[in-house]
Amino acid sequence: VTFDDPNEEGRRWQIDVTFLTSHWQCIFGHGCQGVLTERAPEMVQGCCSYGAHFSNRKDRDRVVRAAKELTDDEWQYAKAGRAKGVYAKCGKDEEGRIEWRTRLVDDACIFLNRPGFPAGPGCALHQKAMRTGRHHSDLKPEVCWQLPLRRTDEDQEDGTVVSTFSEFGRDGWGDGGQEFAWWCTEAPEAFTAAEPVYRSMGEEMRKMLGDDLYKQVVAYLDERTQSKPPPAPHPSEVPVQFTRRRPAARGSNGSRRRR
């Protein structure tokens, strides 16, 4: 569905109704197989194996400040982070500008606490947010809290911009995404949330779309989900079907026998 941006003239949004009305949820530590070339749930790395690419300097600086809040008890690689910094160069973009990502330690993001660490496996920044009553988007790199939502902008010949808001599929990772042994938006086991994505990831969507547009999207999707026919289901969302068990027939002696 398409919306005109309520606060920016010349920007039109294309919204992915199918994914936003699905019941996807992050299953980190509860069935997530990771993003390596082989399934590795025992490593509990989620999508943290390659570090997080920063969107811009503002994103990077915010994470640097957040890292300063972490204690040694909260962050397994605190000493490495303080000694070498939490980010490193990772190449250049198409315009020749240096790109940065979170530093890697032992083949995964420096903020990823591993199995066996007393605070438990998972992102130290995410865990910090949960302990302090903040939303994880306040502390984590943008790409981390946005997943699996994705925004792309495309300039038009008439000077306008079309922004597409959709699912972050394998293609979002570049060529390497096709080598993943597993990806969560293709896994039926991840489509088990009680609420649709546009509700469960409301805070993330507000930050990506803006409050005014988010409210318009919610109003539209609320109406669409109640309409007949409902939106097309996501290809990975398998509807749960309940079947009634047939009662066993009784034999001539009163005992039950199965059909």
Predicted regions and their residues:
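Short loop/turn segments that flank or connect secondary-structure elements
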Residues: 1-259
